[in-house]
Curated annotation (Swiss-Prot):
Family: Belongs to the ABC transporter superfamily. Phosphate importer (TC 3.A.1.7) family.
GO MF terms held by the record: ATP binding; ATP hydrolysis activity; ATPase-coupled phosphate ion transmembrane transporter activity
Protein name, entry field: Phosphate import ATP-binding protein PstB 1
GO cellular component: plasma membrane
Listed CDD domains: ABC_PstB_phosphate_transporter (cd03260)
SUPFAM superfamilies on file: P-loop containing nucleoside triphosphate hydrolases (SSF52540)
Catalytic reaction list: phosphate(out) + ATP + H2O = ADP + 2 phosphate(in) + H(+)
Biological process, per Gene Ontology: phosphate ion transmembrane transport
ABC transporter domain segment(s): 13-254
Length: 259
């Protein structure tokens, strides 16, 4: 009996038979994926395969797109994400998201990080100061910006802006952080900083990352799901996926035969 089996695996995200349609076009087919707590799970696959669409089902961002229909079961922390009565503000607090392009608000660095806590009712300046410092430290940004918190976030470098967006997510203490190609617009040095940050953050958070960069997936993830044509072809520990894939389609993609 493995240690993992003996200790019983804790899944924070559980999905079953998830289908998604954009109008009449089916984008996801019977997706069943259980994601472990405090791990990094990578979603890989060619463009248009459904990986970003699936990521957005986890905090219902697809609801913002006209004519989208999602069916199946999605539970996060035991809560039914598909429940029509769910508190969407609370869901997106619990399940934060970092996008491909850094999207800082046109505010000061301080106000970017304090925005979420203020939205959730925190007004005390001392408490906000503590949250801002903690979040910027967690995002490995405090030492770079602590003496210019009142300056506009728009003047930061691209890599700093992306880490600021991560700090903004951390400020509301999510359980899960979704990342959609978070380093694709960054230079190699900034990418390395974000990757180091992801590895540090998984001690306290569960991270699901969409990436086209297979080397990145192999460096930072514990498990990897390979998507193709709206379905999951293979889901396994990352080492197995990249060194001994069970499916020929996975092997063909990993080896660069298509995609």
């Amino acid at each position: 009996m493995t240690t993992e089996t003996a200790e019983k695996v804790e899944y924070i995200i559980e999905t079953k038979d998830v289908d998604l349609f954009y109008g009449s076009k089916q984008a996801l087919q019977k997706i069943a994926l259980n994601i472990k707590k405090n791990q990094v799970t990578a979603l890989i696959g060619p463009s248009g395969c459904g990986k970003s669409t699936f990521l957005r089902t986890l905090n219902r961002m697809n609801d913002l797109i006209p004519n989208v229909k999602t069916t199946g079961e999605i539970h996060i922390g035991g809560e039914n994400v598909q429940d029509p009565k769910i508190d969407m503000v609370n869901l997106r607090k619990k399940v934060g998201m970092v996008f491909q392009q850094a999207n800082p608000f046109p505010f000061s660095i301080y106000d970017n990080v304090a925005y979420g806590p203020r939205m959730h009712g925190i007004k005390d300046k001392k408490v906000l100061d503590e949250i801002v410092e903690r979040s910027l430290r967690q995002a490995a940004l405090w030492e770079e910006v602590h003496d210019r918190l009142d300056r506009s976030a728009i003047g930061m470098s691209g890599g700093q802006q992306q880490r600021l967006c991560i700090a903004r997510v951390l400020a509301v203490k999510p359980d899960v952080i979704l990342m959609d190609e978070p380093t694709s617009a960054l230079d190699p040095i900034s990418t390395a900083k974000v990757e180091d940050l992801i590895l540090e953050l998984k001690k306290d958070y569960t991270i699901v990352i969409v990436t086209h960069n297979m080397q990145q997936a192999s460096r930072i993830s514990d498990e990897t799901a390979f998507f193709l044509n709206g379905r999951i072809v293979e889901f396994a520990d990352t080492t197995s996926i990249f060194t001994n894939p069970a499916e020929k389609e996975t092997e063909d993609y990993i080896s660069g035969r298509f995609g």
